[in-house]
């Protein structure tokens, strides 16, 4: 039989990778030095768990699927206590179960990176559709006040860029970070040139200088306490979900409580300065336009078009 073929014209550029948002996040986290990935499968980020498990040996990190989202969050905080950079992924319902642990991250100043894939709620909602309904949830998740970092990439390239930034900043400032995505980005495939990714600074972690006794929550000018990890001969590395003093011992003293709350919230100033150094906002279109369209996440390219 005759065979008819159509030759497509060359685009005049180098070939690009075709990847989805989940894969881009995974590659970005690996780029940022991830050491452990913990998750319980939930649409639309199940593909991320599969991707990380498939390439765990190649990238040299640990992948664990425990029994629930509660275990996911607490296991990641335990790894952070031991000095391992961990990330988790979930969707809205799973993040509901994680919120107490998310607040523990804020109180104990244990870094964790959460990939939160949005889908329509409430409750189970429409698990195979896309949504952008959980920005306020991420901003206010967890009891009490504590700093957190949230980014909402619009494309796989931005997901690849910002995932290591969240991981690094979360560790530098010892705060929880959220990569807020949705089904459209997570499971949509895009032509992507990773060579266009922004370069990131090296986010140094404040290390303990060896002065005894070790104070896990030592108050500093930046609010960031020096980190040390067990086992530490002759020293105790104590973290606490209760309000605590510099050594990590539980306290109900009013002055100490105020000082610790101000210490934690004081990190926001430094964190905001770090974000200002990065291209966190993308502006397109004519500069003389009288109307601006503000958008975030996967709606960005749609609005831009």
Annotate each PLM feature:
Residues 36-40, 81, 160, 167-169, ...:
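Broad hydrophobic/π-residue packing in well-ordered secondary structure
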Residues 47, 122-123, 158-159, 186-189:
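Short, well-ordered, mixed-charge alpha-helical segments that flank or form enzyme active sites
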Residues 49, 99, 160-164, 304:
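Conserved strand-to-helix beginnings and helix N-cap segments that scaffold or border functional pockets
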Residues 129-178, 182, 204-209:
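Conserved thiamine diphosphate
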Residues 2-141, 147, 152-153:
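Thiamine diphosphate
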Residues 3-32, 167-305:
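Flexible, low-complexity linker and terminal segments
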